[in-house]
Amino acid sequence: MIRIGQGYDVHKLAYDRELIVGGIKIPYEKGLLGHSDADVLLHAITDAIIGAIGAGDIGHFFPDTDMAFKDADSAELLEEIWQKVEADGFRLGNLDATIIAEKPKMAPYVEQMKLRIAELLHADSAQVNVKATTTEKLGFTGRKEGIASLAVVLLEK
């Protein structure tokens, strides 16, 4: 059986926050604002995986109204979902994700993100693709107000 899921997330950039994308700390003057650590890439991936198994969305499992998830490490949230996926007999076929950000430039960190995500999903790094793009200074990402991410995942059983 093959299942496909897609995920999307966006977070606002804010001062006095660490910038964590794809499980990697990125030096920058701002970080992403959110209930958890606001890792926009891991949130999109988690949402894609949840969608692939037909179990709703990330907010169902980790509501932003629950203080248990305040400042939560998004890698731990992804691992929790991935344990459920593996227990159901699925494994990663492949994952393709895009980070949309004007600043900071993500390209120098993409390989580290790819390796970290593969580790979290018990997969080979060849099964994970992460890329970064801009919106050519258009929209909220172009104005450097936030960062968005898209993810598509294929699971196999």
Curated annotation (Swiss-Prot):
Listed cofactors: a divalent metal cation
Keyword annotations from UniProtKB, A to Z: Isoprene biosynthesis, Lyase, Metal-binding
EC assignment: 4.6.1.12
Reactions the enzyme catalyzes: 4-CDP-2-C-methyl-D-erythritol 2-phosphate = 2-C-methyl-D-erythritol 2,4-cyclic diphosphate + CMP
GO molecular function terms listed in the Swiss-Prot or TrEMBL record: 2-C-methyl-D-erythritol 2,4-cyclodiphosphate synthase activity; metal ion binding
Gene3D superfamilies: 2-C-methyl-D-erythritol 2,4-cyclodiphosphate synthase (3.30.1330.50)
Name of this protein: 2-C-methyl-D-erythritol 2,4-cyclodiphosphate synthase
Species assigned in the record: Listeria monocytogenes serotype 4b (strain CLIP80459)
Underlying gene: ispF
